[in-house]
Amino acid sequence: MPKVRTKDLIEQFQLELVSGEEGIHRPIDTSDLSRPGIEMAGFFTYYPADRVQLLGKTELTFFDTLTTEQKQERMKALCTEETPCIIVTRNQDVPDELLQASRESGVPLLRSAQTTTRLSSRLTNYLEGKLAPTTAVHGVLVDIYGVGVLITGQSGVGKSETALELVKRGHRLVADDSVEIRQEDEDTLVGSSPDLIEHLLEIRGLGIINVMTLFGAGAVRNYKRITLVINLEIWDQKKNYDRLGLDEEKMKIIDTELTKITLPVRPGRNLAVIIEVAAMNFRLKRMGVNAAQQFSERLMSAIELGNQE
């Protein structure tokens, strides 16, 4: 099922439907837009028919210089079965030839009061957000000191309980159990909660609680950029866990790699505090302060000094 249809643009941007009502359910599959200036001159060899077409003052001013026959020919070529819609900006008068071509082909013809540049920018941002690659991950997403931390792990390991403790300590819950993730850019992942379980937290033995009702609006967020993954796993005595922090694990979600930290879970460990510190330490690393690297350098200096003596 298409993520975006022409009718969504009409509703989102309050566009006037001039003609082509039967085509408002046409799918929009790309965030790229087209301003068919060269097409107005008759060059349709590389015409991107599957894009939203914007006709601004420049295009329509040139269009007025054409003969009646050329006008009819260009507008018929502009309206194809693939074209999701044509938008005339600045509330300009719609040419009769375009109106006729729209009625014959069923291509929705829309009009906006906004300038072409402004509308183009808003449309691109909207479509990129809606058409971005998406996935869902089992885990909890919490905003800790401005760092979007995705907490993962097997069911029953204590993710939700840890998130509850973090919320009590002043941090903000984004999603529990299922985190919907969309890739808005090459290195930007944004997580949010499904509408059905938004602001809800499931605690075994207690049931489902509404975090916003219990702790207030300041305890929740609707979405957050994910920059750190913390994986909780039951402590394995046979496994060697990182004790210095020099080696950095990575986890790939869609096409983006994120820093991953594995935390072993066993009685007596305060996971909420450890995750808080992990988030703060991650921020420090991004600011150029790496405690593990500093310790390693001190150790090497001490060894070299000892060898000289």
From Swiss-Prot:
EC number from the UniProt entry: 2.7.11.-, 2.7.4.-
Sequence segments annotated as region (Important for the catalytic mechanism of both phosphorylation and dephosphorylation): 201-210
Sites where the protein binds ATP: G153, Q154, S155, G156, V157, G158, K159, S160
Keywords, ordered alphabetically: ATP-binding, Carbohydrate metabolism, Kinase, Magnesium, Metal-binding, Multifunctional enzyme, Nucleotide-binding, Serine/threonine-protein kinase, Transferase
Region (Important for the catalytic mechanism of dephosphorylation): 264-269
A GO term, aspect molecular function: magnesium ion binding
Other remarks in the entry: Both phosphorylation and phosphorolysis are carried out by the same active site and suggest a common mechanism for both reactions.
Protein name (database record): HPr kinase/phosphorylase
Species in which this protein is naturally found: Bacillus mycoides (strain KBAB4)
